Amino acid sequence: MARLAGKVAFITGGGGGIGRATAERFAEEGAKVVIAEIDRESGEAAAQSARGRGGNAGGDALFVHTDVRERASVEAALAETIKRFGKLDILHNNAGGSSPVDGPVTEVSEEEFWRAIKLDLFGTFLCSKLGIPHIVKAGGGSIINMSSVVALKALPGRDCYTAAKGAIAAMTRSMAVEYAPKKIRVNAIAPGVVLSERVKKLLANSKDIEKLAATHLLGLGLPSHIAETAVHLASDESSLTTGQIVSVDSGATVV
């Protein structure tokens, strides 16, 4: 039987990279997937791909244009989810990302700091705040936040990004305690370097690739590696797992 059969999942930032790979795997495992994405073209393409992969298992996918920084946008996306699929079981707060203009606190702008906080941390907060009541109505479920290896290990020159991802890890633990009585499990994934198409382009002409490879003992990750962990955390296989920051980093945190 498909591991997510009968489940409805809401994935933010599902148009590319880890989000798209996760949407495809969720659909393959029988879930009805809502891809909440700000970019219409990538969101539609991801939904079409997920639908194609999920047919044999009963999976389906829907794209909903969503800006996780705006309450009205998230409310509308969740309303469309309930209208289309009737409930919400799984919330994957995946939207976020680093910026090339990040830097040390004495050099980075205040605007960049708030940009990182609003997209990564506030977006996770807002989608959880508005999504949890729907999960409660469904009888419980799973929330999967997206932290990073930088929440566990220093990354000089990325003080805005590390602040946001570290806060997400802390919030994940407190949410896990808060909502356990409601039968909601809350965990976060902390990836190392993941070779999405965007990251491949950034590293194409960079000498950093050799340095990164040396600290990732089993090789650099792919979006599919993170997606497999998300499937596990979304499924009943992890029924006793909550409050955990799950590193999928090829050993980067132990080097």
Residue ranges and their predicted role:
Residues 98, 102, 153, 218, ...:
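Short C-terminal tail/terminal secondary-structure segment
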Residues 102-105, 109-117, 199, 211-212:
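Substrate-binding pocket helix/loop in short-chain dehydrogenase/reductase
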Residues 133, 177-181, 239:
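Alpha-helical segment proximal to the catalytic Tyr-Lys
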